């Protein structure tokens, strides 16, 4: 099992992954900007649809599932798409538009109070920690923040990428001036901005033992034990134990690799 999610998943993953099960030498051609799609051999019908919240998790997960024998013969193709978490609708759940997705229980309950009729929990993810990570050690005070730039995710529904860092500033009595907050679409853009000096610190998440890139001397913990949510599967497919175990294996491999890379 993992010691942290991703995504938020957030994300936010988000994530060029390296620890997926070994794939065929020739990858399948994949789809448009917000979607990765590939055919499955055999006589299956319909599409196995996966919803993630980060582009960086989509392609490697699609490549893994496109070579997965457990899906061959049952489905005609695999489609992995990503979108902002706020775009998931009650209709998406009740019409079973996705066979696999990440989210949090309270979000799904808010959309469809009886969502368990449509989705079953497949893989619960452990809590994680949120930090401010700087080019220099982070001190959270009005004086230290003066003239500094903080990188956040532009997704206002992201706990780790948006809400918790702003809560931390508010708790410290810090009122950012115009231009001190910089917003980015993905976590890899945050990390790149920090490395180039475009921002002075960013919001970050890390798991002990899984993030060799993370420098604790330059990080300030702002929230511990943040619920990471879970992966959910179409309740009709959850009865297939072999398929469920296969999907868990792919998800764990993908997220483990994700943790070893910069957010």
PLM feature spans:
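N-terminal hydrophobic or amphipathic helices and topogenic motifs
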Residues: 1-97, 249, 253-263
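Acidic, polar ligand-binding/catalytic clefts
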Residues: 22-28, 85-144
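Periplasmic-binding protein-like
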Residues: 43-46, 124-134, 213-254, 261-263
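Bilobed "Venus flytrap"/periplasmic-binding protein-like clamshell domains
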Residues: 45-70, 129-186, 191, 262
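Structural motif
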Residues: 51-56, 103-105, 135, 154-156, ...
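Sec/Tat-exported extracytoplasmic proteins
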Residues: 69, 97, 105, 136, ...
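Short, hydrophobic alpha-helical packing/hinge segments within bilobed ligand-binding/sensory domains
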Residues: 86-92, 187-193, 199
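A ligand-binding cleft/hinge motif common to bilobed small-molecule-binding domains
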Residues: 102-114, 193-226
């Amino acid at each position: 099992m993992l010691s942290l999610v991703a995504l938020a998943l957030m994300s936010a993953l988000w994530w060029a992954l390296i620890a997926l099960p070994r794939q065929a030498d020739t990858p399948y051609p994949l789809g448009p900007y917000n979607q990765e799609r590939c055919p499955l051999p055999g006589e299956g019908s319909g599409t196995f649809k996966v919803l993630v919240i980060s582009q960086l998790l989509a392609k490697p997960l699609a490549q893994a599932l496109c070579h997965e024998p457990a899906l061959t013969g049952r489905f005609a193709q695999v489609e992995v798409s990503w979108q902002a978490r706020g775009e998931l609708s009650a209709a998406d759940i009740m019409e079973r538009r996705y066979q696999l997705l990440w989210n949090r229980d309270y979000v799904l309950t808010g959309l469809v109070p009886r969502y368990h009729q449509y989705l079953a929990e497949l893989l619960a993810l452990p809590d994680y920690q949120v930090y401010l990570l700087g080019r220099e050690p982070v001190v959270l005070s009005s004086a230290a923040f003066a003239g500094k730039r903080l990188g956040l995710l532009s997704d206002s529904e992201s706990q780790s990428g948006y809400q918790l860092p702003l809560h931390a500033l508010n708790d410290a009595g810090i009122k950012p001036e115009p231009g001190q907050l910089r917003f980015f679409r993905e976590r890899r853009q945050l990390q790149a901005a920090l490395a180039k000096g475009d921002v002075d610190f960013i919001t970050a998440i890390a798991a002990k033992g899984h993030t060799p890139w993370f420098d604790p001397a330059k990080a300030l913990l702002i929230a511990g034990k943040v619920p990471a949510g879970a992966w959910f599967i179409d309740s009709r497919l959850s009865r297939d134990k072999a398929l469920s175990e296969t999907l868990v294996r792919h998800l764990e491999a993908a997220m483990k690799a994700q943790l070893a890379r910069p957010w």
